[in-house]
């Protein structure tokens, strides 16, 4: 058992090192997309399922409250947060529509969609991206494996941050580091703290 625990840490570290070497430019580009969105008076909309739903909510909480330094609240909406809306849409239509209907109601040109799916194949996230595309909302997709269906939906103005792993747990661990890196880019760009 102890050996397996050690192996988990080793594999996580190796995946994070590989991701840091591969994903830096994409993370930086995504962070600056978010900065421009916020400077334009727009909002970041996030969605995902399971652990990715938790990441989507966590990211929005970091923007609405703070990341590591005191600053004004920033506009962000997690489409996972309103259980009444999610269950209403799932019951009256289908679960595939729980995010796309919200985007059609809440999303506007100038916003950014942060779509999180470890497999890249989550149907409701795919439909969210399709709704965002129809509203000219740029997409930042956090994926893993081969990028799945999501990878094929992204256009020139979108960014895919694909973790180089085929293991969901490792992908989710790197996604959290990516999200914290995005928070740091936003905070240090919008609210520079001097030499710190």
Swiss-Prot record:
**Binding of Zn(2+), residues:** 58, 62, 172, 180
Tell me the cofactor note: Binds 1 zinc ion per subunit.
Q: In which pathway does it act?
A: Carbohydrate biosynthesis; D-glycero-D-manno-heptose 7-phosphate biosynthesis; D-glycero-alpha-D-manno-heptose 7-phosphate and D-glycero-beta-D-manno-heptose 7-phosphate from sedoheptulose 7-phosphate: step 1/1
Q: Which cofactor does it need?
A: Zn(2+)
Gene3D superfamilies (alphabetical): Glucose-6-phosphate isomerase like protein, domain 1 (3.40.50.10490)
Tell me the GO molecular function terms: carbohydrate derivative binding; D-sedoheptulose 7-phosphate isomerase activity; zinc ion binding
Instruction: Name any GO cellular component annotation.
Output: cytoplasm
Q: Which GO terms describe its biological process?
A: carbohydrate metabolic process; D-glycero-D-manno-heptose 7-phosphate biosynthetic process
InterPro entries found in the cross-reference section: GmhA/DiaA (IPR035461), Phosphoheptose_Isoase (IPR004515), SIS_dom (IPR001347), SIS_dom_sf (IPR046348), SIS_GmhA/DiaA_subfam (IPR050099)
Q: Give the subcellular location.
A: Cytoplasm
For this protein, what reaction is catalysed?
Answer: 2 D-sedoheptulose 7-phosphate = D-glycero-alpha-D-manno-heptose 7-phosphate + D-glycero-beta-D-manno-heptose 7-phosphate
Residues binding substrate, per UniProt = 49-51, 62, 91-92, 117-119, 122, 172
Q: What is its EC number?
A: 5.3.1.28
Q: Has the keyword Cell cycle been applied to this entry? A: no
Q: Which Pfam families match?
A: SIS_2
**Any idea where the SIS domain is?**
34-192
Q: What keywords is this UniProt entry annotated with?
A: Carbohydrate metabolism, Cytoplasm, Isomerase, Metal-binding, Zinc
Give the enzyme class. isomerase
Q: Does the keyword Metal-binding apply?
A: yes
Function description: Catalyzes the isomerization of sedoheptulose 7-phosphate in D-glycero-D-manno-heptose 7-phosphate.
Any additional notes?
The reaction produces a racemic mixture of D-glycero-alpha-D-manno-heptose 7-phosphate and D-glycero-beta-D-manno-heptose 7-phosphate.
Assembly, in brief, is:
Homotetramer.
Query: Which protein family is it in?
Result: Belongs to the SIS family. GmhA subfamily.
Tell me what this protein is called.
Answer: Phosphoheptose isomerase
Please give the organism: Colwellia psychrerythraea (strain 34H / ATCC BAA-681) (Vibrio psychroerythus)
> Lineage of this protein's species?
Bacteria, Pseudomonadati, Pseudomonadota, Gammaproteobacteria, Alteromonadales
| Designated gene of the protein | gmhA
């Amino acid at each position: 058992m102890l050996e397996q625990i050690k192996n988990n840490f080793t594999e996580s570290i190796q995946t994070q090192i590989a991701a840091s070497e591969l994903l830096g430019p994409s993370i930086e580009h995504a962070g600056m997309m978010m900065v421009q969105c916020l400077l334009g008076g727009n909002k970041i909309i996030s969605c995902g399922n399971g652990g990715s739903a938790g990441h989507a909510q966590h990211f929005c909480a970091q923007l609405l409250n703070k990341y590591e330094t005191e600053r004004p609240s920033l506009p962000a909406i997690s489409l996972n947060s309103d259980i009444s809306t999610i269950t209403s849409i799932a019951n009256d239509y289908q679960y595939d529509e729980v995010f796309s209907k919200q985007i059609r109601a809440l999303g506007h040109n100038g916003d950014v969609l942060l779509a999180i799916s470890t497999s890249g194949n989550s149907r409701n996230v795919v439909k969210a991206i399709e709704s965002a595309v129809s509203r000219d909302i740029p997409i930042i997709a956090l994926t893993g494996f081969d990028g799945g269906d999501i990878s094929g939906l992204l256009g020139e103005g979108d960014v895919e941050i694909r973790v180089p792993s085929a293991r969901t747990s490792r992908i989710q661990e790197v996604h959290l580091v990516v999200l914290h890196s995005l928070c740091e880019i936003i905070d240090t760009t919008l609210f520079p703290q001097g030499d710190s």
